[in-house]
Amino acid sequence: MQSSRFVSLSQAVFLLALSTASGGALGQQPGSDFQPRVGQHGKDVIWVPTPQSLVDKMLEVAKVTPQDFVVDLGSGDGRTVISAARLGATALGIEYNPDMVELSRRNAAAAGVSGKATFTKADIFATDFPNAIAVTTFVLPGNAPAAFAGDPASPTVITLFLLPGLNLKLRPTILNMKPGTRVVSNSFDMGDWQADQTVRASTDCTGYCRAFLWIVPAQVEGTWQLGESQLSLQQRYQYFTGKLATGNVVAPIADGKLEAERVTFTAGGTRYTGQVKGGTMEGTSTSGGTEAKWQAARR
């Protein structure tokens, strides 16, 4: 497989972020002459760089902006993190190989983005990635915490190039992340979790040129009270089915879909659109050209 990073057979997702002040210099060895070799072995993997055109396409489909906190899993020579930082995002690379971490820091410094792009040496399997904190905190060896100035922010974008089995292992945890988190995987899918979008690099790419985007959906599985009716839902990733029962009248749910916290479905000829807000859903229903407000609460 090809990547701009090491793709570990035993990796999962990521560590707490480094501060922007220390991220470009912590542990750096300016005189190091290490250069990665295509095909070199890492932790259960080999390393091959991803074409920059695909890196750019992945960040484009994720709609990365300066408001994002991007975390790259197995960040290799740092090109994805550096590219995200060039877009103004705060970006963190997690990499197991310490030589690659130092190389990434040098590359970030050369690109002039050390204030936005940080890197740490870590096994992402041993981290609590949903609680990662951008800019404010990171974990030192021995679990000694260190804090820095900055505002906390959970990851909004995850980029990865892992083997299919690892994607499946990460999937349950990713699905429990904040709704709206964008996940972009180079080349490999998430099994039966259907991608929301698929893109290809158009130039400078001769292999492994496809990427998948998923948007983490809100969780709506269960029973909800919708006025005098009971809404029972069964969720499968960003899609759901179920029924809306009003007394003895039961209407099946059709076209149930979630995009982050946006929910849409049809029941009994009425189209419902709205937003999931924790234990409530609310929005507008349309039936026969007539609109009405609706609200449901989790039971």
Regions found by a protein language model. Give the residues of each.
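Conserved SAM-binding strand-loop segment of SAM-dependent methyltransferases
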Residues: 112-124
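S-adenosyl-L-methionine
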Residues: 25-69
